[in-house]
């Protein structure tokens, strides 16, 4: 927020200030208090994301299984947004999904605006099955028809959990939220559950729990191969029906 404050400090005192924000958090409230006089607030949409319109799963697994299980979820659920903590993590998951044959796009602050716009356009137009994003880059995403949100890495707090999860269950529809949890993270994630007002058991992955979606498989573009990644596809364990085209 510091650059915004610096700009406002250079503006003349007698002015009209109109503030637009995708979220009304404490930082935005500080801006309103410090730089606006008797402001009128206009909010569009519900004041708070409803956790009741979503089905939440908290799956326990080792870190080594997260990539494979993410691919299986995308094949089962279709249009999915995957949230990662870091840019490098998002790139890695995007590469893993692509090498698993899934069309995926990555969205984070390390990309140019043109690259981010292209990734969003492909996801919005149904040209890929998964969008892998960091929290900052995903602010303001409003895409209809997202069936599932995956917390590949746990969010920082309950507020971030709500914000991420709210990318699905838009416009009164339902949504699936799946958190991929390692045992040492249980205490932190339990605190997040309390903050958002849910109480969900930690379980092993169970694809039979997931609802059936009409999924249109979108494969990754074929690339010329100049070497091997040493990935033995036939030896990998699958956790559900992958809905591969026959």
Roles of regions detected by a PLM:
Residues 222-246:
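Intrinsically disordered, low-complexity RNA-associated tracts
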Residues 1-221, 244:
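Conserved helicase RecA-like core
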């Amino acid at each position: 927020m510091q650059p915004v404050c610096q700009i406002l400090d250079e503006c003349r005192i007698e002015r009209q200030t109109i503030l637009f924000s995708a979220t009304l958090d404490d930082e935005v409230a500080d801006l309103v208090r410090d730089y606006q006089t008797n402001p009128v607030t206009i909010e569009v949409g519900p004041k708070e994301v409803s956790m009741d319109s979503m089905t939440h799963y908290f799956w326990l697994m080792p870190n080594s299984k997260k990539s494979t299980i993410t691919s299986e979820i995308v094949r089962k659920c279709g249009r999915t947004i995957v949230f990662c903590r870091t840019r490098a993590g998002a790139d890695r998951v995007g590469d893993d999904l692509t090498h698993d044959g899934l069309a995926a796009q990555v969205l984070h602050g390390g990309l140019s605006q043109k690259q981010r716009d292209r990734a969003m356009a492909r996801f919005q137009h149904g040209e890929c099955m998964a969008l892998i994003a960091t929290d900052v880059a995903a602010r303001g995403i409003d895409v209809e028809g997202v069936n599932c949100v995956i917390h590949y890495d746990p969010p920082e707090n309950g507020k971030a959990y709500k914000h991420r999860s709210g990318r699905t269950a838009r416009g009164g529809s339902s949504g699936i939220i799946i958190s991929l949890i390692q045992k040492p993270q249980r205490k932190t994630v339990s605190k997040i559950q309390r903050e958002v007002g849910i109480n969900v058991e930690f379980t092993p992955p169970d694809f039979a729990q997931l609802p059936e979606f009409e999924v249109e498989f979108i494969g990754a573009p074929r690339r010329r191969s100049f070497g091997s990644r040493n990935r033995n596809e036939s030896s990998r364990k699958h956790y559900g029906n992958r809905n591969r085209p026959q």
